[in-house]
A protein has these predicted regions:
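Core beta-strand elements of the Rossmann-like FAD/NAD(P) dinucleotide-binding domain
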Residues: 8-11, 180-191
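N-terminal Rossmann-like FAD-binding beta1-loop-alpha1 element of flavoenzymes
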Residues: 13-40
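Anionic group-transfer/hydrolysis microenvironments
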Residues: 14, 44, 192
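N-terminal/domain-start segments enriched in small and hydrophobic, helix-friendly residues
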Residues: 2-18
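Mobile, glycine-rich extracellular loop/lid and propeptide segments
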Residues: 20, 175, 186-187
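Hydrophobic/aromatic ligand-binding patch that stacks against planar heteroaromatic rings
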Residues: 24, 28, 50-51, 192
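Conserved N-terminal/central alpha/beta ligand/cofactor-binding core
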Residues: 4-5, 36-37, 43-172, 177-183
Length: 193
């Protein structure tokens, strides 16, 4: 049996988890932190991990503001009615005004989007959903994360978050192990997501 090693990864940003949130956070971290060292660790493989791994047939919220289909105010009104008034309207508005740009980014990355043959707009299923061929959704977003990260570690099970000794109630690092080799990994980044 080979000797177990300890890998210490120094980085500016450590992203724990390679699902849609983690791969998206890795992409955004690079966008906003061009000169930072960014590392992402995932317990499986970022190409097919997380809830979106099996694929989707629709994106459940798209405003279509460029075609004047819906506006953020419309979505806030819908959410307020649907949730019987229990809604943070400011957060709903903020999400709604940014969601189209995320969808356009997925389109640029190559996510197959169904389109209305007459208008060329995205094909709708209901007021808010647009239809996609989403079998490749997660691998497409994972590819963006791979291009954005300095290093991706697959098969790393993070077992403990380390508390920052200098700031109370702040996570300062993470430790885990490679599920295939048994090697330990530790990281004390400037920021952990």
């Amino acid at each position: 049996m080979s000797k177990i090693k300890t890998i210490s990864e120094d980085c500016d940003i450590l992203v724990v988890g390679g699902g849609m949130a983690g791969t998206g956070a890795t992409f955004e971290a690079r966008y906003w932190g061009r000169d930072l060292k960014i590392v992402c660790v995932e317990k499986a493989n970022i190409d097919r991990s997380g809830a979106v791994a099996q694929g989707l047939y629709a994106i459940n919220c798209y405003m279509g503001m460029q075609w004047n289909e819906n506006q953020p105010e419309d979505h806030v009104r819908y959410a307020r009615n649907d949730l019987m008034g229990l809604v943070r309207e400011d957060l709903g508005f903020d999400m709604a005004r940014h969601v189209d740009s995320s969808v356009h980014l997925f389109d640029e990355w190559g996510l197959p989007m169904m389109r209305n043959k007459e208008t060329g707009h995205y094909q709708r299923e209901g007021k808010w959903q647009i239809m996609i061929h989403g079998e490749s959704f997660k691998p497409i977003v994972a590819e963006a994360a791979k291009k954005s990260a300095d290093k991706i570690y697959n098969r790393i099970m993070v077992t403990h978050l380390l508390m920052d000794e200098s700031k109370e109630n702040r996570v300062g690092g993470a430790v885990g192990f490679n599920m295939r080799t048994g090697n330990y990994m530790s990281s004390v980044p400037k920021l952990l997501l």
